[in-house]
Amino acid sequence: MADEKNKPENPDLDQRDINNPRDREALKQAADDFLKARRAEARAEAAADEAEGEVDETANRIAVLEADNTELKDQMLRVAAEMENLRKRTQRDVQDARAYAITNFARDMLSVSDNLRRALDAIPADALEADSNLKSLSEGVEMTERAMLLALERHGVKKLEPEGQKFDPNFHQAMFEVPNPDLPNNTVVQVVQAGYAIGDRVLRPAMVGVSKGGPKVSAENGASTSEDNA
């Protein structure tokens, strides 16, 4: 295309006489035009190469930026996940602190309640009937015990009442066995000392007696199976 534009107006330059001034001028003009065309082509090729190099450099920069963006996004997601886990752990710790803050205090108060109950149980029934003052004192101590247990209950402490339930080592402590073929094996038949729990944690296991020699309860479906007496 550039060659066609730079062709001399007279196509038969090879037939011109170099000794003729006019022909010599025409040949010179044709040579100048040819050189200009070649220089223009060279500049165009150089510009194209430079543009291609700039495109490649831009593409490389874009690739680097995209990689950096992906890495930063991954870091941000990891930080967000860690912050969410930290928030959940903190919330759980706060809830546990609220629920179990009085654990040691409640355990000490249960010991006091046990002592009050032992004192009440140690008073003979005939002595209560014979002495009105002793009876009034006993009633006052019993009211104090009930008020103490109610106060603990308001703060999340609940009494375990396992009599008639299947023995659970997580909540009960077996003190003795009672032969009884009429009850499923390992049924709680007597509570020696009440147990207590706070939230989902055992504050004190219930001390119990369990049955022995009755039908065994299946762990899967609760069906009873016969079991020989030991």
UniProtKB/Swiss-Prot annotation:
Disulfide bonds: none annotated. Belongs to the GrpE family. Residues 1-26, 209-230 are annotated as: Disordered. It is found in: Cytoplasm. Residues 221-230 have a biased composition (Polar residues). Pfam families: GrpE. Participates actively in the response to hyperosmotic and heat shock by preventing the aggregation of stress-denatured proteins, in association with DnaK and GrpE. It is the nucleotide exchange factor for DnaK and may function as a thermosensor. Unfolded proteins bind initially to DnaJ; upon interaction with the DnaJ-bound protein, DnaK hydrolyzes its bound ATP, resulting in the formation of a stable complex. GrpE releases ADP from DnaK; ATP binding to DnaK triggers the release of the substrate protein, thus completing the reaction cycle. The gene is grpE. GO terms for cellular component: cytoplasm. Keywords: Chaperone, Cytoplasm, Stress response. It comes from the Bacteria. GO terms for biological process: protein folding. It comes from Brucella canis (strain ATCC 23365 / NCTC 10854 / RM-666). Homodimer. This is Protein GrpE. Its main location: cytoplasm. GO terms for molecular function: adenyl-nucleotide exchange factor activity; protein homodimerization activity; protein-folding chaperone binding; unfolded protein binding.
